[in-house]
Amino acid sequence: MPRAPNDVWTVDFKGWWLLRSGQRCEPLTVRDAFSRYVLALRLPEASTTAAVKTEFERLFELYGVPNVIKSDNGSPFASSHAVLGLSRLSAWWVSLGIELDRSRPAHPQDNGAHERLHLDIEREIAAHVATDRAAQQAACDLWREEFNQHRPHEALGGRCPAQVYQKSSRPYSTEPVQLVYGAGFFTRRIAANGTLSWRRHNVFVSGALAGCDVGLRRAELGRFEVWLNYLLLGTIDFQTCSFLGSPSLAKEAARLSA
């Protein structure tokens, strides 16, 4: 449970609707879990990694960096075929020191407060379809302003989200991330094809980690642990050139809740 603003941000795409122009409209929503403050209600032209990363860069520059981001297991927030379910987007979050909190597959109630936000949007915005994307974005901006500034919440003691929310104390740097690992680690960069090279050995880890600096630490039986910032990705056996990934975050969440 979040105890302060920016402890947890929640993110999702609301279900799409068609504008009068025939354009598909699929809002990206980002919310501070503690204060209920809606950080973003944006209408990107596509739900791609690049579009969502651009929006998060804007949010981080404006509000700072949260401690945790909670999402479902869908693209571009996660990848079911990659180590730990990491996508390029969530690997970037990890490199920034943000912890990941994933809902269980097919359990939207795990992010229930965010789903209720989407119901409000469905009832109060989507029911009044605008002419085009620009007009619909303007309507979303007005709704977000009203929700944050003028809508009191019982859980906030009758206060509005804007009266509770404050920016993060963790600043965001626009400079490329330079991960530094501690004593006992060797740093290696994942190649564009997702492989890691070590003493003439090439081992595939994950394409989602392309360009990321990972830390290698000796483990038992001649194996090496592979870390991305604080996250243990798995182990590599360079004798067999094989990588064994850690259990996915979603599977681990399901196991713990069983």
Whereabouts are the PLM-identified features?
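Mobile-element integrase/transposase regions
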Residues: M1-Y37, E45, T49-Y63, N67, ...
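Acidic/histidine-rich, metal-coordinating catalytic segments
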Residues: S47, L59-V83, R104-A106, N111, ...
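Basic, flexible linker segments flanking DNA-binding modules
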Residues: M1-T10, W16, L84-S90, C160-S169
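C-terminal, beta-rich DNA-binding module of retroviral/retroelements integrases
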Residues: R144, N148-A258
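A structural microfeature
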Residues: L39-A40, G234
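Generic short beta-strand
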Residues: L28, L41, F224-E225
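Charged alpha-helix within mobile-element recombinases
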Residues: L89-S173, G215, A219-E220
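Short, glycine/charged-enriched secondary-structure capping and boundary segments
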Residues: Q23-C25, A82-L86, R116
